[in-house]
């Protein structure tokens, strides 16, 4: 199993759709990948929460992953979101993603069925045994209604050497702290919340899987790049400059605000698939104003 570099800013890619939402806009996806790499991100994560994975068909998911891999051309690693409420489906999706060229997979904790900690452990170990590739765990209890504990994560890591990282979107810096204490030398910890990236890196996380970097890859990756280079003051300044936008991209369900921002920049349609709906006018105006303030600050510096 090859090593997977996991530090810096990884973009949780949106999936561009045609204006009617009926098909994936692959031209816009190609352009998005190119913009991310030009902006200095460390890697790409298609078909996660931000990629609207629940409303993609299996064929679309595989096609999106393959297209991202092709567009990246080996310049950055591609880690595909393959998690599901079903262990069997997670294994099947992970194998398909690897066959499409992904360097690793990210598996969200099973949602809806509300498994116990033992269930989360057995699910993850079953996937790890069946998928001999780097695996990133994804804990986002606000969406899955199950919270992978630090103790369970430690038990998983003891039994599954190919579990190499965790995207922690618990919103709990104390959880990050406990993960670092237990597993800091064994497991790479990545923030799953742009607004907490700097705090989590101060505790020992190595980067972020970011939503905001879809819109501003250069500015978002500057936070992690500066921190990892030892420039705490520069990282803090870059982080604080983005804080307003981080918040605005979640005032409505993700990824509708991010797609609204990208549409305003002319990069894709704002279309999302039901049951999501496009961001409202008030949100679009707030995002536009925040972007203008960021641009003015950049020009003044």
UniProtKB/Swiss-Prot annotation:
One of its GO terms (biological process) is lysine biosynthetic process via diaminopimelate. It comes from the Bacteria. One of its GO terms (molecular function) is 4-hydroxy-tetrahydrodipicolinate synthase activity. The active site is at residues 138, 167. Disulfide bonds: none annotated. It catalyses: L-aspartate 4-semialdehyde + pyruvate = (2S,4S)-4-hydroxy-2,3,4,5-tetrahydrodipicolinate + H2O + H(+). Its main location: cytoplasm. SMART domains: DHDPS. Pfam families: DHDPS. InterPro entries: Aldolase_TIM, DapA, DapA-like, Schiff_base-form_aldolases_AS, Schiff_base-form_aldolases_CS. Pathway: Amino-acid biosynthesis; L-lysine biosynthesis via DAP pathway; (S)-tetrahydrodipicolinate from L-aspartate: step 3/4. Pyruvate binds at residues 50, 209. Keywords: Amino-acid biosynthesis, Cytoplasm, Diaminopimelate biosynthesis, Lyase, Lysine biosynthesis, Schiff base. GO terms for cellular component: cytosol. The record marks 49, 112 as: Part of a proton relay during catalysis. It is found in: Cytoplasm. Its EC number is 4.3.3.7. NCBIfam families: dapA. Homotetramer; dimer of dimers. Belongs to the DapA family. Catalyzes the condensation of (S)-aspartate-beta-semialdehyde [(S)-ASA] and pyruvate to 4-hydroxy-tetrahydrodipicolinate (HTPA). This is 4-hydroxy-tetrahydrodipicolinate synthase. It comes from Sorangium cellulosum (strain So ce56) (Polyangium cellulosum (strain So ce56)). The lineage of its organism: Bacteria, Pseudomonadati, Myxococcota, Polyangia, Polyangiales. The gene is dapA.
